[in-house]
Design a protein with these regions (language model features):
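Exposed beta-strand face motif in extracellular beta-rich ectodomains
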Residues: 273-275
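Mature catalytic domains of secreted/periplasmic carbohydrate-active enzymes
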Residues: 1-269, 278-296
């Protein structure tokens, strides 16, 4: 993205352009990119923009791509997303949907600016294709998924073509392996949402089943249409054993939910006949978009 022109140490072949001329070139190039390639889902401001370009870029975005998410775009777009602060594929826990700092956000901020986690398929933080580049293992990518998407962070996993302009077959296979895992693990809940009871305030949701099932993780999604309002929660399950079929046990608890929170139960797979989500702290009436449990081998 645009930078400030520095003409004090020009090298042979460099033009001595003014900041005004440079800004004009940038704006013309942005108009071309934002006009000739259809509707854009996301625009990256990787490195920011100069003060002199802030207002012109804001106007251009509003005119040409008003619905696009603007990565690092706070100040020029209302649809901004913030950087999580690392390219390793891990978000802090908790990770809030509000705040503009490059970290886990701020639950007390009035600025809605969800985080994006960008990382590479190749090892050693390598973004561009290389002849001898190696790929991250499937197990590592699964961990990346849980520590980004599962922590309320949008995952942007690098997609790099080779010198033919195509995605190498080995790369495509690794992407598919990750997709297959996500679909097989999280595609269907062991306890469907139809088997649900809740109180009028929606501060707790309980899933139940007539025959015991084995599960090892839970997924919560908060409806953030009017903001992120949940501040803490507990997930507990009703165990099935030979001595007491009515024993409740806490398997997960946390603070931020946001778009998605995946809790891998440290106690491992459990045989249960009910699971309950209790919202223990909220700043407004909570709306749970989804609450599911799963068993993943």
């Amino acid at each position: 993205m645009p930078i400030k022109v520095q003409n004090r140490t020009l090298k042979p072949g460099q033009l001595n352009v003014t900041q005004k001329t440079y800004d004009n070139i940038v704006l013309q190039q942005l108009r071309e990119l934002w006009t000739n390639y259809g509707t854009l889902d996301e625009i990256w401001f990787d490195g920011g923009y100069t003060t002199s370009l802030k207002d012109p870029i804001t106007a251009l975005l509003t005119e040409l791509q008003p619905e696009a998410i603007a990565f690092n775009g706070y100040g020029v777009s209302l649809n901004s997303a913030r950087w999580i602060g690392t390219e390793m594929g891990i978000a802090p826990d908790p990770n809030w949907s509000t705040g503009i700092t490059n970290d886990g956000g701020d639950p007390n901020s009035s600025i809605f600016c969800p985080a994006e986690c960008d990382t590479t398929l190749q090892n050693k933080d390598r973004w561009f294709w290389g002849v001898n580049a190696t790929l991250r293992s499937l197990s590592e990518l699964i961990q990346v998924y849980h520590e980004t998407v599962g922590r309320n962070c949008l995952l942007m996993l690098d997609l790099t073509p080779d010198r033919t302009g195509l995605i190498p077959p080995a790369y495509a296979r690794r992407y598919k392996e990750l997709g297959d895992f996500i679909r097989s693990c999280y595609g269907t809940s062991v306890l469907p949402m139809e088997n649900l009871i809740s109180d009028d305030s929606l501060e707790y949701i309980q899933l139940f089943v007539s025959s015991p099932v084995t599960v090892d993780r839970s997924v919560i999604q908060e409806d953030q249409t009017y903001g992120q309002v949940i501040r803490s929660y507990i997930v507990d399950v009703k165990l099935v054993n030979t001595t007491n079929t009515h024993q409740w046990m806490i398997v997960a608890q946390g603070t931020s939910i946001g778009n998605k929170k995946i809790d891998l139960w440290q106690v491992g797979p459990l045989l249960i006949n009910a699971v309950r989500l209790t919202i223990t702290k909220t700043v407004d009436k909570p709306v749970i978009k989804s609450f599911t449990v799963h068993l993943c081998n």
